[in-house]
A protein has these predicted regions:
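Glycine-rich flavin
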Residues: 13, 21-136
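Intrinsic disorder at enzyme termini
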Residues: 1-8
């Protein structure tokens, strides 16, 4: 039984590695570390153009319809490059949670915008009253 990546996934890895070598050098990462937002709109646009924010989003919502194994290939390379910004929280955490737990209306309203990079998701939890329920 072969547990390796497919030929397409290896091609995806090579493309990601080349893209990140060209667009996410250490100097850029250090600049983003010094930026309070750690977000660069031009870099985010490049990720969007590659389809990374929508990789796990179904095609019916404007995404790539990729698998978690496809995302693993991207995340491994992004981790090696220390990719700054909202990619991990939006594409890897928030999008799958919305796909699995969001209402049909939320999916219809938000997922296409996430796939286009227009909506950046994150993960948070709070009590219904709007607090975290911690007692100080």
């Amino acid at each position: 039984m072969d547990f390796g990546f497919s030929e397409e996934q290896e091609m995806l890895r090579d493309a990601a590695k080349r893209f990140l070598a060209d667009n996410c050098p250490t100097k850029f990462v250090r600049q983003m570390m010094a930026d309070p937002t750690a977000h660069d709109a031009a870099f985010w646009k490049k990720l969007v153009d590659l389809g990374w924010p929508g990789l796990l989003i179904p095609e019916s919502y404007g995404g790539q319809g990729g698998s978690f194994l496809d995302m693993t290939v991207i995340v491994e390379e992004a981790g090696k490059a220390l990719v700054p910004g909202p990619f991990f929280t939006s594409a890897l955490l928030a999008a799958p949670l919305l796909i699995e737990g969001g209402s049909d209306q939320q999916k219809k309203d938000i997922l296409p915008r996430m796939a286009k990079g227009e909506f950046i998701g994150t993960v948070a939890i709070a009590e219904a009253a709007g607090c975290f329920g911690f007692t100080v």
